[in-house]
């Protein structure tokens, strides 16, 4: 079995419910579920979950399922967040109820409606915080917001992740 799949998952305060075709993780931040592939066994005892398989073809998939399960457990207990920064003159973000209104240099404000399970907030006018229990959805929402105005390489203007480094280019010499 793969090294990732062998590592046990510490559940903590999360309740893991394993059926024949699905796995459900329930915690303080919500509930997430996963369709369990056939041939992979998930055992839960004493607050620790372990995965195993008899089929040699499913070894790689077992490691993938273990990583997804681990992210589900972390998501329903602590949650995930992604921070975005707006760089540029006049670039601003503001909340209008549950919707995010972005001024990104277009002739109109861009309004983004957050999907269910995602919380958007703006600590400052140039910062956006995306929070939620599902790691994949949090990353997807952050990528959609970033796609409205990707950072350009000459001045670095646009929407970027807080930990992203923009590689700069030099302007053409006349």
Swiss-Prot record:
Keywords: Ribonucleoprotein, Ribosomal protein, RNA-binding, rRNA-binding. GO terms for biological process: cytoplasmic translation. GO terms for molecular function: rRNA binding; structural constituent of ribosome. PROSITE patterns: RIBOSOMAL_L6_1. Gene3D superfamilies: Ribosomal protein L6, alpha-beta domain. One of its GO terms (cellular component) is cytosolic large ribosomal subunit. Pfam families: Ribosomal_L6. SUPFAM superfamilies: Ribosomal protein L6. NCBIfam families: L6_bact (TIGR03654). This protein binds to the 23S rRNA, and is important in its secondary structure. It is located near the subunit interface in the base of the L7/L12 stalk, and near the tRNA binding site of the peptidyltransferase center. Part of the 50S ribosomal subunit. Belongs to the universal ribosomal protein uL6 family. This is Large ribosomal subunit protein uL6. It comes from Stenotrophomonas maltophilia (strain K279a). The gene is rplF.
């Amino acid at each position: 079995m793969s090294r990732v799949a062998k590592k046990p998952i510490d559940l903590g305060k999360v309740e893991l419910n394993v059926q024949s075709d699905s796995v459900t993780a329930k915690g303080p931040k919500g509930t997430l579920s996963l369709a369990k592939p056939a041939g992979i066994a998930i055992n839960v005892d004493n607050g620790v979950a372990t995965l195993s398989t008899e089929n040699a073809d499913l070894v790689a998939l077992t490691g993938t399922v273990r990583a997804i399960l681990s992210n589900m457990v972390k998501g329903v207990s602590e949650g995930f967040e992604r921070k975005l920064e707006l760089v540029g003159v006049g670039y601003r973000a503001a909340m209008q109820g549950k919707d995010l209104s972005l001024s990104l240099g277009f002739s109109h404000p861009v309004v983004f409606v957050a999907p269910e399970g995602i919380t958007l907030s703006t600590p400052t006018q140039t910062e956006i915080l995306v929070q939620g229990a599902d790691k994949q959805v949090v990353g997807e929402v952050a990528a959609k917001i970033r796609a409205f105005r990707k950072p350009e390489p000459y001045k670095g203007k646009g929407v970027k992740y807080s930990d992203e480094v923009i590689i700069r280019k030099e302007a053409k010499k006349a």
